[in-house]
């Protein structure tokens, strides 16, 4: 589901750019820092957590509980496409906002506001949370209503007061 969406969004962004001016889109063939490329063209995260046994599945709580299993195995091209889409304003309803409009890299991927500003200057109900370590989470949004990153992604994308897009508009 996620890869289909990524591919569709990538094609939409690419076709929109191609309609404006001929351009060559190339995706990275190397992994980001902290990742290692496997023989199967997958980026694997390497961290200090790899050196310790996890207590996550052993029912042990408190400060000694390790992080949950991480999501690994994306190719360098998939990671780079995700990065390009994150900064692409074509995903918003009026093509003026990207994910990075509210999740500023220099602000810890948050916006530093009590309430975020969305499409047409509309005010969101809350501020954008930081995106640090999101790959380790098992629920998303302030009320934990989304159980995956894929499910979470549709929230701000389709919210009328955030990015204000629709599935039909994305495909048009």
Task: Name the predicted role of every residue range.
Residues 17-172:
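Periplasmic c-type cytochrome electron-transfer domains
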Residues 2-14:
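Bacterial N-terminal signal peptides
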């Amino acid at each position: 589901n996620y890869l289909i969406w990524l591919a569709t969004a990538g094609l939409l962004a690419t076709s929109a750019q191609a309609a404006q001016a001929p351009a060559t889109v190339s995706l990275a063939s190397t992994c980001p820092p902290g990742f290692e490329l496997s023989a199967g063209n997958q980026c694997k995260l390497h961290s200090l957590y790899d050196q310790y046994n996890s207590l996550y599945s052993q029912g042990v709580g408190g400060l000694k509980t390790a992080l949950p299993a991480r999501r690994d195995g994306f190719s360098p091209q998939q990671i780079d496409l995700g990065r390009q889409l994150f900064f692409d304003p074509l995903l918003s309803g009026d093509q003026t906002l990207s994910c990075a409009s509210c999740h500023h890299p220099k602000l810890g991927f948050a916006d530093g506001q009590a309430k975020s500003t969305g499409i047409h200057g509309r005010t969101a109900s809350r501020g954008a949370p930081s995106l640090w370590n999101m790959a380790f989470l098992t629920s998303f949004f302030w009320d934990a209503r989304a159980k995956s990153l894929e499910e979470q992604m549709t929230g701000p994308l389709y919210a009328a007061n955030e990015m204000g897009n629709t599935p039909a508009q994305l495909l048009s």
